[in-house]
Every structure is written in structure tokens, then in C-alpha cells.
UniProtKB/Swiss-Prot annotation:
Residues 13-133 form the MARVEL domain. The keyword Repressor does not apply. This is Chemokine-like factor. The chain crosses the membrane at residues 19-39, 45-65, 74-94, 107-127. InterPro entries: Marvel, MARVEL-CKLF_proteins. Keywords: Chemotaxis, Cytokine, Glycoprotein, Membrane, Secreted, Transmembrane, Transmembrane helix. Glycans are attached at residue 142. The gene is Cklf. GO terms for biological process: leukocyte chemotaxis; lymphocyte chemotaxis; macrophage chemotaxis; neutrophil chemotaxis; secretion by cell.
Length: 151
């Protein structure tokens, strides 16, 4: 008698909530960067937001091409969480710095979009932490005794 095959419930990245949150994060960060560029804000504002846009594009490309499943040497969800924490700190500092002094309206709008980036980044971090907590994979997954016998 044939053994039952495992049903894999695989949803492509483009249709997942993670993709929606990352895309929203990318759009809001790009909007913040555009406002900073148009307002000729201080260079650190533009550089930090540009750096964040580059990292988000890299992560979206990584997940779209399923390279996180191919390159097993890194634990990608943990790197994504660390990136989200660092992005939250940097964008919070940039947004507060843009809103505190009396600046132009465009810089203030860029700061507001920076705060929206922080909110999207926290949501992305919470989503990744939930994935780490409830669905571990790879060498970090707890294996049962029956899984060890099958190997």
C-alpha cells in the first residue's frame, strides 16, 4: 500500500501578506526619499532612506526568486527581523530630526512618511517574529522521534 503523500500548502511570495507589507514599506520609504530629495533636505536624510530602499528591494528580490530557500547558509527570517529593527531605529531618528526644527513643508511631509515607514517596518518585524515563533524551518526546526527514524 502506498504511503500518503504530504500535501504542501505553498503560497507564492507575491500573494502573501509578507509581500504586501514589504511592498507597502517600499512605497512609503520611496515617497519619504522623494520628498527629502525635492526639499533638498540634509544629505543624511536622503542617504539613509536611499539605503533602506536598496535593502528592501534586495529582500523583495530575494523572496520573489525563492533564494531564501536555496541559500540555506543564512537564517533569512532572523536577518529580516534584525534589518527591521535597525530600519526602525534609523527611520525614527531621521523622522524626528526632520520634524523637530522649523523646516520646509516638504521635509515635514518626508518626516511623516518616515513615521509611516516605521509603522510598516514594525508590522513587518511582527510578521517575521510570528513566523519564527510558530513555523520554524531548516536546521532550527524541532524534529520528532519519527522524523529521526525516517532519515
Amino acid at each position: 500500500m502506498d504511503s500518503p503523500q504530504k500535501v504542501v500548502d505553498h503560497q507564492p511570495f507575491c500573494l502573501s501578506l509578507k509581500c504586501f507589507v514589504k511592498t507597502l514599506r517600499l512605497v512609503v520609504t520611496v515617497a519619504s526619499m522623494i520628498f527629502f530629495i525635492v526639499a533638498q533636505a540634509p544629505e543624511p536624510y536622503i542617504v539613509i532612506t536611499g539605503f533602506e530602499v536598496t535593502i528592501i528591494l534586495f529582500l523583495i528580490a530575494l523572496y520573489m526568486c525563492s533564494l531564501d530557500k536555496t541559500m540555506r547558509s543564512f537564517f533569512w527570517p532572523l536577518l529580516d527581523v534584525i534589518n527591521s529593527v535597525v530600519t526602525t531605529l534609523f527611520m525614527l531618528i531621521v523622522s524626528v530630526s526632520a520634524l523637530i526644527p522649523e523646516t520646509s513643508t516638504m521635509i515635514m511631509v518626508g518626516g511623516v512618511f518616515g513615521f509611516l515607514t516605521v509603522i510598516c517596518t514594525v508590522a513587518d518585524c511582527a510578521l517575521m517574529c510570528q513566523k519564527l515563533r510558530f513555523r520554524p524551518h531548516g536546521p532550527y526546526q524541532n524534529r520528532s522521534a519519527t522524523d529521526v527514524d525516517d532519515s
